[in-house]
């Protein structure tokens, strides 16, 4: 098991690991509320990558990693990931205009 200190390196190596063997690669999140620690693990039974954090800002990055993995799983491992971000997907939803009754 390898703990990776840099978030960007963890994401890059995780995507490479998934693209190398998409059938057996899995992604696990574990959160311990009493410690406030989040551990992300990506493994393909040969190599195991781990990232540990206790920073709340990393939760937003975790959502982006989820979107990346969902895209890779749904569209295939050869998809271009340059357009995958959490903000762009959220902005495409139509905005609600009011709280009142529809007329």
Curated annotation (Swiss-Prot):
SUPFAM superfamilies: Signal recognition particle alu RNA binding heterodimer, SRP9/14
UniProt superkingdom: Eukaryota
First and last residue of the signal peptide: none
Sections of the chain in a coiled coil: none
A GO MF term: 7S RNA binding
Entry's Gene Ontology cellular component terms: cytosol; signal recognition particle, endoplasmic reticulum targeting
UniProt KW keywords: Cytoplasm, Ribonucleoprotein, RNA-binding, Signal recognition particle
Region (Disordered): 81-103
Single GO biological process annotation from the record: SRP-dependent cotranslational protein targeting to membrane
Annotated InterPro entries: Signal_recog_particle_SRP9/14, SRP9, SRP9-like, SRP9_dom
Compartment(s) where it occurs, according to its Swiss-Prot or TrEMBL record: Cytoplasm
Family recorded in the similarity comment: Belongs to the SRP9 family.
Quaternary structure annotation from Swiss-Prot or TrEMBL: Heterodimer with SRP14; binds RNA as heterodimer. Component of a signal recognition particle complex that consists of a 7SL RNA molecule and six protein subunits: srp72, srp68, srp54, srp19, srp14 and srp9.
Protein's job: Component of the signal recognition particle (SRP) complex, a ribonucleoprotein complex that mediates the cotranslational targeting of secretory and membrane proteins to the endoplasmic reticulum (ER). SRP9 together with SRP14 and the Alu portion of the SRP RNA, constitutes the elongation arrest domain of SRP. The complex of SRP9 and SRP14 is required for SRP RNA binding.
Protein name: Signal recognition particle 9 kDa protein
Source species taxonomy: Eukaryota, Viridiplantae, Streptophyta, Embryophyta, Tracheophyta
